[in-house]
């Protein structure tokens, strides 16, 4: 039976300007960058969506609800073309309109909220969606509050976990929190899930891939243990690649 997944969140364009620098500016001691190549890919929630489509057996059942004109929201990373060292990141300043309708149509087996806290979703919107759908996977840059209580699973990295510690200490949600810890894998419900060691080329988008793989596998199996293991494996493949990319089911 075909599964349906909806991804909700704010999107952008991830732009990678691959450069070389052979001299310093004459007026200031800063490197002069010569851009050799530029690669643009959809990022943030759109990257989660792309990964879900690439991993699921039912790509026609995958939908995305995101901000209009997401192409105007650009994160530009200036990266050395040879060492992959990132010189700097420049973000465009764009006001993102709030979601127009947070009523989710029936028929979705899973909803993924990928909230980068750029204005598309408020805490009230997230609470409403989680309350009105039984299987929401939540990944948010907001400091968590009681509005997140109804999420089926909360995926959170170390930095965001520390910011939301008060919430975790005062609520009973630990059995639904998946804490990602980079090269140390992730932690869920008292168990650590190790990840294969890999030479890291770029961490950009690894969290998106983890979230997509986790939700896809759980939608298929309803087994959170195997879903976390699968998500770890997918994320470890992505960090070996440059830029914001997707992982394909055929690799497994």
Model-assigned labels for residue ranges:
Residues 59-64, 153-158, 193-195:
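Short hydrophobic/aromatic-enriched beta-strand-loop microsegments
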Residues 9, 53, 66, 140, ...:
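Short beta-strand/turn micro-motifs composed of small residues
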Residues 5-8, 112-113, 137, 155, ...:
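Generic enzyme active-site microenvironment
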Residues 10-11, 116, 209:
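Active-site metal-binding loops of divalent metal-dependent hydrolases
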Residues 94, 107, 125-150, 165-252:
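Conserved phosphate-binding/catalytic region of the ribokinase-like
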Residues 3-5, 13-113, 123-125, 245-252:
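Conserved N-terminal subdomain of the carbohydrate kinase-like
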Residues 22-28, 75-93, 110-169, 184-185:
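Conserved beta-alpha-beta core of the PfkB/ribokinase-like small-molecule kinase fold
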Residues 37-44, 117-121, 153, 160, ...:
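Catalytic cores of large soluble enzymes that bind and process phosphate-bearing ligands
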């Amino acid at each position: 039976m075909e599964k349906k997944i909806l991804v909700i969140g704010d999107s952008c364009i991830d732009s990678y300007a691959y450069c070389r620098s052979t001299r310093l500016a004459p007026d200031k001691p800063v490197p002069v960058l010569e851009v050799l190549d530029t690669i643009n890919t959809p990022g943030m929630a759109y990257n989660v969506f792309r990964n879900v489509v690439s991993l699921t057996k039912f790509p026609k059942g995958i939908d995305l609800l995101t901000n209009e004109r997401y192409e105007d929201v650009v994160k530009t990373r200036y990266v050395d073309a040879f060492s992959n060292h990132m010189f700097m990141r420049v973000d465009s300043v764009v006001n993102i309109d709030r979601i127009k309708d947070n009523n989710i149509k029936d028929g979705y087996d899973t909803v993924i909220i990928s909230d980068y806290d750029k204005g598309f979703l408020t805490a009230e919107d997230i609470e409403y969606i989680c309350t009105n759908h039984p299987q929401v996977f939540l990944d948010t840059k907001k400091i968590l509050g009681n509005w997140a209580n109804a999420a089926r699973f909360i995926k959170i990295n170390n930095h965001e976990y520390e910011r939301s510690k008060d919430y975790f200490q005062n609520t009973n949600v630990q059995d639904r929190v998946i804490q990602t810890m980079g090269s140390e894998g992730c932690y869920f419900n008292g168990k650590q899930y190790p990840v294969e060691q890999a030479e890291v080329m770029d961490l950009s988008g690894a969290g998106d891939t983890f979230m997509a793989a986790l939700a896809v596998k759980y939608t298929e199996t309803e087994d959170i243990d195997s879903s976390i293991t699968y998500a770890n494996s997918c994320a470890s493949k992505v960090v070996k690649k440059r830029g914001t990319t997707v992982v394909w089911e055929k690799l497994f």
